[in-house]
């Protein structure tokens, strides 16, 4: 088995919700929930938080994870790549898990790791679309080849269904990524793409430069904390047993 690291990028100064990783959720910092759930995933050798903030680093260690202090980074993926270089031993597979997903299901992490067993360089997840989601720009859609590799990701409703109604071929993207350590370095060295800029979707950089992304299925719907209202909803879901 290859050495697998889950690296969670987290910064204090989020514009919409400053201090989000340290926000209290059921008696512990939000970032602690992400660390603890990632540790429950099978096949994970190390869970680390990549951050430029000592307070977040302390919370990560208190939750049982590693903390890696990084410099200023343009994107979370850049922060993950820097952290991966600092880990010893160096991981062979790196999972980029967002630090605002306190309800992440360990099975979703296992699914994206499992997709890498086919020898691919990069993988992500998708789930069935719920009713009405096809038209929502906040929900990123993905269509794939027969091989399971992504053809395109878009905020637009893809594919268009000539017969009308929502296409059964459309799926919702779930933003968890796995990379080989070597391809993570390649990816972060690539110039941002034009379509990436138009859609504001970083994963399009790989497709624009001719690299494949394997897309695996998951039942996890994804739930990121972007606002204090989202945090209240997460509190309710945890209280209900999520």
Swiss-Prot record:
GO terms for cellular component: cytosol. It holds the Pfam family CTP_transf_3. The keyword Transferase applies. Pathway: Nucleotide-sugar biosynthesis; CMP-3-deoxy-D-manno-octulosonate biosynthesis; CMP-3-deoxy-D-manno-octulosonate from 3-deoxy-D-manno-octulosonate and CTP: step 1/1; Bacterial outer membrane biogenesis; lipopolysaccharide biosynthesis. SUPFAM superfamilies: Nucleotide-diphospho-sugar transferases. It is an enzyme of class 2 (transferase). One of its GO terms (biological process) is CMP-keto-3-deoxy-D-manno-octulosonic acid biosynthetic process. It is found in: Cytoplasm. The keyword Ribonucleoprotein does not apply. One of its GO terms (molecular function) is 3-deoxy-manno-octulosonate cytidylyltransferase activity. InterPro entries: Cytidylyl_trans, KdsB, Nucleotide-diphossugar_trans. Coiled coil: none annotated. Its EC number is 2.7.7.38. Keywords: Cytoplasm, Lipopolysaccharide biosynthesis, Nucleotidyltransferase, Transferase. It catalyses: 3-deoxy-alpha-D-manno-oct-2-ulosonate + CTP = CMP-3-deoxy-beta-D-manno-octulosonate + diphosphate. Belongs to the KdsB family. PANTHER family: 3-DEOXY-MANNO-OCTULOSONATE CYTIDYLYLTRANSFERASE, 3-DEOXY-MANNO-OCTULOSONATE CYTIDYLYLTRANSFERASE, MITOCHONDRIAL. HAMAP family: KdsB. Activates KDO (a required 8-carbon sugar) for incorporation into bacterial lipopolysaccharide in Gram-negative bacteria. This is 3-deoxy-manno-octulosonate cytidylyltransferase. The lineage of its organism: Bacteria, Pseudomonadati, Myxococcota, Myxococcia, Myxococcales.
């Amino acid at each position: 088995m290859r050495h697998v690291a889950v690296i969670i990028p987290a910064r204090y100064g989020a514009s919409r919700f400053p201090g989000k990783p340290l926000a209290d959720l059921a008696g512990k910092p939000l970032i602690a929930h992400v660390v603890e759930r990632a540790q429950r995933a099978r096949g994970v050798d190390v869970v680390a938080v990549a951050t430029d903030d000592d307070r977040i680093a302390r919370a990560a260690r208190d939750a049982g994870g590693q903390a890696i202090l990084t410099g200023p980074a343009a994107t979370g993926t850049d922060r993950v790549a820097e952290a991966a270089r600092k880990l010893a031993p160096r991981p062979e597979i790196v999972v980029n898990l967002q630090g605002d997903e306190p309800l992440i299901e360990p099975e979703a992490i296992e699914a994206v790791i499992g997709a890498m067993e086919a020898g691919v360089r990069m993988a992500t997840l998708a789930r069935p679309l719920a009713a009405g989601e096809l038209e929502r720009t906040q929900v990123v859609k993905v269509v794939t080849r027969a091989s399971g590799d992504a053809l395109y990701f878009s905020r637009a409703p893809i594919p268009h269904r000539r017969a009308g109604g929502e296409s059964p071929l459309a799926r919702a993207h779930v933003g968890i990524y796995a990379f080989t350590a070597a391809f993570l370095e390649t990816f972060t060295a690539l110039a941002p793409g034009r379509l990436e800029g138009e859609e504001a979707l970083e994963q399009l950089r790989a497709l624009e430069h001719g690299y494949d992304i394997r897309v695996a299925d998951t039942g996890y719907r994804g739930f990121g904390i972007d606002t204090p209202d989202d945090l209240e909803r997460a509190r309710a879901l945890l209280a209900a047993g999520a």
